[in-house]
């Protein structure tokens, strides 16, 4: 299945049903009073995270989602039926952005998590709501309010513990094939990997972590060269980055300059991502003698000003891979995700009609006090009054 990590959709919540103006009419009850019911609320639009999905490709074809309108109120104090909600399932790791305001509405980080993205319109009020001691035959009603309408951008960001960085042909896909059951394509030409892939590294029956492989970066990626840096967003939630360096590039390029290019593109994309823990991993040491590989790795680390520990591996022969994985596992255990590091959810997403009824009824009470001397009768020729008609 094609990997799609961005999609734009339109969500429209249902309008609220209108209130009803009606008076009770039964045998022997000539003046039964008002009995107009309220309308029904409009349906909401929800997003729900589903761990069984891994792409947004469905929303490249189906782009519009509309909830049901609430039914109008009826006589005999019958309330209109509420509109049906619409639930849109998205992969875990999806970020939701309102394109109209640029607001991040939320991050779908857990299976089953639900997020309301469009709130249905409030129901209109029937004339029963407006009866009082001075207004016994109210002809007022209110109309249902329109539902929210939003253009949303869905961005899928893979959830992984470890992310891999490197130039094309640095051996990232070979590494993920060696440590997990993932089988990304491997070949001797650049940009073999065109889309991100995930692999689960199982150290034993109880310990495991997830590693993400993204397409390689080249100089100018921030300006769109190669595959650009659009896939770097998949590393934003990783706890540690493995920077793979081809210790003996087949094209004769300088490993030091290659490493600096990756660091530079990382900083151009995001300072937060550049500040994440990053480990230096020299790959393809099987192409050199051990002494020569050690000498070259030391020289590269010194040229980069690297003072921390670095690793020497061969993903193809799996030399040094197990020790690296155990160190990664230990780091993950010692640095669990804390609440402050998780994506911050907005405290409250503002919708159009959150305070509509409270404000509306307050206005009606004020009007009733002003009109205490009105003496309406059900036979009056006055028309129905609409409160806050839009």
UniProtKB/Swiss-Prot annotation:
Q: Which domain of life is it from?
A: Bacteria
GO cellular-component terms in the record? cytoplasm
* Keyword Repeat found: no
Q: Which cofactor does it need?
A: Mg(2+)
**One Pfam family of this protein, by short name?**
MMR_HSR1
Task: Using the UniProt annotation, give all residue ranges assigned to the region (Disordered).
Answer: 127-147
The question of whether Magnesium is a record keyword is answered with yes
Which is one GO molecular function term here?
GTP binding
* Compositional bias ranges of the Polar residues kind: 129-143
Q: Where in the cell is it found?
A: Cytoplasm
Instruction: Provide the residue positions that the database annotates as binding GTP.
Output: 166-173, 191-195, 213-216, 283-286, 314-316
Please provide the record's keywords in A-Z order.
Cytoplasm, GTP-binding, Hydrolase, Magnesium, Metal-binding, Nucleotide-binding
- Per UniProt, Mg(2+) binds at 173, 193
Please name the GO terms of the biological process aspect recorded for this protein, alphabetically: ribosome biogenesis
The EC number on file is: 3.6.5.-
Report domain OBG-type G positions.
Answer: 160-333
Query: Any idea where the Obg domain is?
Result: 1-159
Give the family, as the similarity comment puts it: Belongs to the TRAFAC class OBG-HflX-like GTPase superfamily. OBG GTPase family.
What PANTHER family does the record point to?
A: DEVELOPMENTALLY REGULATED GTP-BINDING PROTEIN-RELATED, MITOCHONDRIAL RIBOSOME-ASSOCIATED GTPASE 2
Its biological purpose:
An essential GTPase which binds GTP, GDP and possibly (p)ppGpp with moderate affinity, with high nucleotide exchange rates and a fairly low GTP hydrolysis rate. Plays a role in control of the cell cycle, stress response, ribosome biogenesis and in those bacteria that undergo differentiation, in morphogenesis control.
What is the protein's quaternary organization? Monomer.
Q: What's the protein here called?
A: GTPase Obg
- Organism for this UniProt entry: Citrobacter koseri (strain ATCC BAA-895 / CDC 4225-83 / SGSC4696)
